C-alpha cells in the first residue's frame, strides 16, 4: 500500500548521514534546507515503522488466538490501532504545499454594499485579529484606509508565527491555515442605518498571500517606479504634512503595493516592499500552477457578491462555507475569533481531494 515510503526512508537515512557531517554545516543555507527536509520526512518514517510493527504484532496475536481465544480481543485492538495509523500515514503522504511554513499578508477590501461593506470589512479584521490572538500568532497592521463610519475600505495585515520567521515545524505556518480565507465573504444583516428592518446583503474580499523572503523573489531596482505622496485618513483628511506615503509599481508585471501607516517614508517603503515581494511570489506561483486545482487559485480578486465562498447571516446567527458545505449556528463566536471549526472543514476537504488525486 505504501511502497513509495521506502524511497522516502532511503532519503531520510541519507539526510541523517549528511547532517552528521560537520562540513555540511559550513554552508548554513544548505544545512537549513537539509534540516527542513529531514524534519518533513521524520514523522512519515516513524509512522510507517509503527504501521509495519503493528502489522507484525497482528500476525503474532492471530497465531496465539488460534490456540487461545483470550487473544481474540487483542487482535481486534491491534487492528483498530493499525486502521488509525494507516489513516495518519495517508494524511502525512498528502502532497504538501511548499508555502505552508510561511507567514502571510492578509488584505481585506470592502466591496459591494457601500458603508455597510466597509463596516463588515472591519468585522472581518477583528475576527482575524482575535483568531490570531487565540492561536498565538502576531499581527501587524501595515496599511489601512478607514471609512467615514469606522469600517475599512482597505486594510492590510501581516500575520506571523510567534518566532516571526515562519513555522518551526513543517506545515505549521500561518499559510497552512489562513490560505483558505481567500475569496469573497458575504454578509446578510440589518444595517444600523436601516429604519424599516430590512436585511441587506453586502460583501468584502479577502486576499491571503504567503509572505515572501528576499531569497524567494528577485527584484531589480530598475524595474521599480517609486512614488511618494501625502498620507491621508478617513474622508481624505490629511494626517501628514510631508510626502511620507509610498507607492511602488513593479513595471514588468504592473503589480502595485503601497503603504502610508508608518511615520517615515523609509519605513513605508520597507513595508511596501514586503507587500510587493509577497504579491510577486503569489503571482509567480499562480502562473506556474495554472493547470493545477490549487486552492490558492480560487481566491477571488473582484469583490462580487455572486462569487462568494462564505456567508455570514446575522438574523440566523449562521455561518456557511459554500465550498465544503460547512454550516454552523454560532456566528457570534466565529466573529469573536473561533474560526478553527470552519478552517478545519476546509483543511479536511483539501486533504481528501489531494488524497483522491494522489
Curated annotation (Swiss-Prot):
Question: What residues bear N5-methylglutamine in this entry?
Answer: 237
Question: Pfam families under this entry?
Answer: PCRF (PF03462), RF-1 (PF00472)
Q: Which GO terms describe its cellular component?
A: cytoplasm
Q: What does this protein do?
A: Peptide chain release factor 1 directs the termination of translation in response to the peptide chain termination codons UAG and UAA.
Q: Where in the cell is it found?
A: Cytoplasm
Q: Which NCBIfam families match?
A: prfA (TIGR00019), PRK00591.1 (NF001859)
Query: Keywords on this record?
Result: Cytoplasm, Methylation, Protein biosynthesis
Tell me which domain of life the UniProt entry assigns to the organism this sequence originates from: Bacteria
Q: Main localisation, per the record?
A: cytoplasm
Q: Which family does it belong to?
A: Belongs to the prokaryotic/mitochondrial release factor family.
Query: What's the name of the protein?
Result: Peptide chain release factor 1
Quote the PTM field. Methylated by PrmC. Methylation increases the termination efficiency of RF1.
Molecular function GO terms recorded: translation release factor activity, codon specific
> What InterPro entries does the annotation carry?
PCRF, Pep_chain_release_fac_I, Pep_chain_release_fac_I_sf, Prokaryotic/Mito_RF, RF-1
Q: Which organism is it from?
A: Streptomyces griseus subsp. griseus (strain JCM 4626 / CBS 651.72 / NBRC 13350 / KCC S-0626 / ISP 5235)
